[in-house]
Amino acid sequence: MSHFPKLLSSQIAFDVARTMLDGFDKHYRLFREVSHQAKLKFEAGDWHGLQQIQRDRIAFYNERVRESSVILEDEYDAENIEDEIWQQIKLHYIGLLTNHHQPELAETFFNSVCTRILHRSYFNNDFIFVRPAISTEYIENEESPTRPTFRAYYPGSREGMAACFERVVHNFQLESPFEDLQRDIGYVVRAVSEHFGDLRIAPNFQVHTLSSLFFRNKSAFIIGRILNGDRTFPLAIPIVHGPSGKLTLDTVLLKKEQLLILFSFTHSYFMVDMEIPSAYVTFLRDIMPRKPRAEIYTSLGLQKQGKNLFYRDFLHHLQHSSDKFIVAPGIRGLVMLVFTLPSYPYVFKVIKDFFPAPKETTRELVKSKYQLVKQHDRVGRMADTLEYSDVAFPLSRFDEALVREFEQHAPSMIEYQRGKDGGEEIVVRHVYIERRMTPLNIYLTEGTDEQVEHGVIEYGNAVKELIAANIFPGDMLYKNFGVTRHGRVVFYDYDEIEYLTDCNIRDVPQPRNEEEEMSGEVWYTVRPHDIFPETFRTFLLGDTRVRAAFLRHHADFFDPAMWQSHKDRLLAGHVHDFFAYHSSERFIHRYSEAGSAQGTAAVPDPGPARRVA
């Protein structure tokens, strides 16, 4: 730090630091309260209530940042505080975090408040946390030894596993009764034995489970790991309400790929109570070492921390790469200017200044659609986005064609400035960042017959799961869907999405005369929010291979009755079950006696468990 203050002499500096930390502590207290509510609502089967607190929680962070900023402006005239005092504020804040259990989150909160108060030209290393100041290693929950980050169990042998897993379940103290816990524990032990086969039990054989349940959609997940010798295996046990209304263990997941799907960027955030979030992230990284810490924080509902870490990783990549940002390959969009850095697996999307026909939208409406997706259950079929404002890029790293695209289609979204090193920078005023995927239209055009079959099956499943979750994609062209690196189809173009319950599902009227029948134009009245599933054939079935696969697997896609049935169930208050694993993994399907005991209610199938978004 330049001009490091030799003496922390300002009482105002300490008071401001204390006020900012109080704001964060209030935020995290409310954040944890949602997790407590999630347990109660899960036990009661209050699915609409769970959805509501999930939506509400997303707004908590910005509300507390605004609240803290107002207090600092009103009580300390924060915008006019001298630079020397800001340096002292940061140092006092570091001191206050010495024994804090969420220091990394509190540092990010400090940055958010600072950047709200100060102009971006003041965002320098002296005022904000560009790197962590407080270590998060080995933070222990000493205040509550009965709630460690994780619990360790020692089965002793294969024969002791049943008692071990029974203790695991009981320690979560769920108030709702289980339908038949002994039966389900038997299935868990059976599945574990089948998975490990003749694996020799080592002296250190043990099971670790995180102390809090992970709530999402209509499931609660036990997350843990199995240690044997020098090997570590992931463990996840979803708990659901069975057809009887009582709790059941739905399956056990023991593969890294299955955990990666569970924590995918295409799913909504978990609700989980964490006293020490960094310890949870460390545990999860142990069973998913390929998963970036930024994505793990985000999946835990700490999306601002994920966003902060992502940006640090991005700056690090820029520092150690030399390729240029280019216009993203593929069909140009009417609403978004999309660019990418070939060496980095993400795309950057900027809303254009104007939209040619037939698009009828506005910048604010597009932003509202992206916010809708952020707050909705993405059911593994919509990519999460990171939203940033005033991002400065080195101009020398922008391809000339990309600069021309900006100046032609989004001139209001950029400005030029000199960086601290004297180099020219291009500042993008607002940008969404998403994981880069292969556009489905390219995948279907260039793929083998087997890949086309797979892509069509996935596309149909994706749309059906979205409408079951009350999302109508709007523009369903293949170019608006992507294929992840492991073959899962995901929707990523949100400017035309609507709630299915707001749409009118209609049959195409019968032509009244020969002129209407032969007309190449739409001759019937189309109102806003009207959907005509029969017309989807026109733009989905043009390719011979695609058509054959589509009609084999998703012929009902063009039947208005299929769409209307989903809408009717949604209007009746039904909340669908969505599973982040293949239905064949569920005990009711895996073991015949489970199926006969519990029934086999039809649920949307997310596809083969090997696929990782």
Swiss-Prot record:
- Does the keyword field hold Signal? no
The terms describing its cellular component in GO are: cytoplasm
Please name the catalytic residues of this protein. D384
Q: Where in the cell is it found?
A: Cytoplasm
Question: What's the main place this protein lives?
Answer: cytoplasm
- Domain of life, per UniProt, equals Bacteria
Task: Provide the GO MF annotations for this entry.
Answer: [isocitrate dehydrogenase (NADP+)] kinase activity; AMP binding; ATP binding; phosphoprotein phosphatase activity; protein serine/threonine kinase activity
EC number(s) for this protein?
2.7.11.5, 3.1.3.-
Q: Which residues form the signal peptide?
A: none
BP-aspect Gene Ontology terms: glucose metabolic process; glyoxylate cycle; tricarboxylic acid cycle
Question: Which of UniProt's keywords are assigned here?
Answer: ATP-binding, Cytoplasm, Glyoxylate bypass, Hydrolase, Kinase, Nucleotide-binding, Protein phosphatase, Serine/threonine-protein kinase, Transferase, Tricarboxylic acid cycle
Q: Which InterPro entries match?
A: AceK_kinase, AceK_regulatory, Isocitrate_DH_AceK
Q: Which reaction does it catalyse?
A: L-seryl-[isocitrate dehydrogenase] + ATP = O-phospho-L-seryl-[isocitrate dehydrogenase] + ADP + H(+)
* Annotated positions binding ATP: A328, P329, G330, I331, R332, G333, L334, K349
Q: Give the family, as the similarity comment puts it.
A: Belongs to the AceK family.
Annotated function: Bifunctional enzyme which can phosphorylate or dephosphorylate isocitrate dehydrogenase (IDH) on a specific serine residue. This is a regulatory mechanism which enables bacteria to bypass the Krebs cycle via the glyoxylate shunt in response to the source of carbon. When bacteria are grown on glucose, IDH is fully active and unphosphorylated, but when grown on acetate or ethanol, the activity of IDH declines drastically concomitant with its phosphorylation.
Q: Which HAMAP family match?
A: AceK
Name this polypeptide is given: Isocitrate dehydrogenase kinase/phosphatase
Organism this protein belongs to: Cupriavidus necator (strain ATCC 17699 / DSM 428 / KCTC 22496 / NCIMB 10442 / H16 / Stanier 337) (Ralstonia eutropha)
Identify the gene encoding this protein: aceK
